[in-house]
Amino acid sequence: MSKTVRTLALGGLVLAGLSACVSVPRGQGSGAAVVDHVSDSARQAEAARQAWLQAHPHWSFQGRVAISKDRNGGSGRIDWQQDGPRYRVQLSAPVTRQSWVLTGDTTSGAGRLEGLEGGPRSGPDAEQVLLEATGWTIPVNQMPDWVRALRIAGAGAARVDLDAAGRPRTVQQDGWTIDFLAWTPASAEQPELPQRIEARSGEAKVRLLVDQWTVSP
């Protein structure tokens, strides 16, 4: 079997498994509108939020994700665990009981994908490993910052639109457009964090709905 055929077959198996799950529902509430002016107090609050998150690099979230490209796509559960630059992401399809685990390091960019027919795949570029195995285009090395709406303005973003609270509303970066559509409220343990995110680049689209955030002290 050629490498191209193997890649398409692996991608088809993963998409078939995830497609058995229900699609990601729309989160409650809508994203705040983009504004032309943000108050100084709102900017200070957002700066404090980002500083707090930068000081807490160990975190996790559980939720639902939908991934599509061209006419192919699927949805399932996602469990993301971040330990500084290292991450472990588990995608699972409860109906088919299939799961895939991607581990990597945002410093080196390398990654390893397990759960595929034929055994694990690894390489120096986690995004390329994922693309070759599944056909998905997902910016996994940027995701730890994107999912928390963290350090976006200082990371070479082409455009950042803010809402009245000073939080990112829409970001254009590295060929992707990221919309922050809903936020979890702040608590005594942690500040506001994104609840519903949509990211798109050409025909590729990722939708994420976070059910629970956990940030370690």
UniProtKB/Swiss-Prot annotation:
Endpoints of the signal sequence: 1-20
Subcellular location: Cell outer membrane
Database matches in Pfam families: LolB
Lipoprotein found in the keyword field: yes
PROSITE patterns: PROKAR_LIPOPROTEIN
Annotated membrane topology: Lipid-anchor
Record keywords: Cell outer membrane, Chaperone, Lipoprotein, Membrane, Palmitate, Protein transport, Signal, Transport
GO terms for cellular component: cell outer membrane
Annotated lipid attachment (N-palmitoyl cysteine): C21
Keyword Chaperone: yes
Start and end residues of each stretch annotated as Disordered: 105-124
Gene Ontology terms: biological process: lipoprotein localization to outer membrane; protein transport
Lipidation, S-diacylglycerol cysteine type: C21
Entries under InterPro entries matching the protein: LolA/LolB/LppX, OM_lipoprot_LolB
Oligomer and partners: Monomer.
Function: Plays a critical role in the incorporation of lipoproteins in the outer membrane after they are released by the LolA protein.
Family label: Belongs to the LolB family.
Descriptive protein name: Outer-membrane lipoprotein LolB
Organism: Xanthomonas axonopodis pv. citri (strain 306)
Upper lineage: Bacteria, Pseudomonadati, Pseudomonadota, Gammaproteobacteria, Lysobacterales
